[in-house]
Amino acid sequence: MASFTPEVIGYLGFFPITNTLLDTLFVDTLLVGGTFAVTKNLSLVPQKAQNAVEALLETFYDLTTSVAQNRAAKIFPYFMTFFLFILLANWSGLLPGVGTIGFFYHHGEEKEFTPLLRAATSDINTTLALAIISAIATHILSIQITGIKDYISRYLSLNPLNLFIGILEIISEITKVISLSFRLFGNIFAGEILLVTISGIFAFLFPLPFMLLEVIVGVVQALVFGMLTMAFMAIMTTPHHHKEGVEDPRTK
């Protein structure tokens, strides 16, 4: 049965190396390697593979533009980075050997199995880190685009009503981090438990429909995380005291 917490494979000094950390490094390697492979032989007259990648990126960029409008160019890289990393991290748990190749160790009289790799997003530490990075990037982008004065005015004001709203905004930012992290973790961890249970009871073809379901869940959860981050960034990069019908030059 999958453990709620990641298993420790070894230590680097006093720093524990978990199987989800190894999977994170594996996914990072795939992303970096894939980026080099895709961009290595770009041409003005694109071939089939380049055409497919460009069409996919254009679709996502149009989606970002529909949400963030003239801030799309700044928000799009964050959206795609989160989407691709989370997608590969979700799918990595379905690869042969992930969760099944490892070693046994004795815990008292019992023998327990520790997998060498485990889907990174099935670890609450990973999803919480992603949510915190998303929140920090959102606030940095907000300051860059709207300015520090406008940013502070969202949370601090001499007006008692606006000050109360600002406090609610701060609470809202905390709940965003919690909801982003637990939504992703809960769905992927539940899928991991489901696959382990089904595979333990049945063999061969019966688990395949559930694996297909997890492929779809992996896409949906990556898209949800990326789009929520995109929406939060679009909201935070809109000037707080934006006048209707007047475009703030700082958002260009």
Give the location of each predicted region:
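Selective transmembrane helix interface/packing segments
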Residues: 1-252
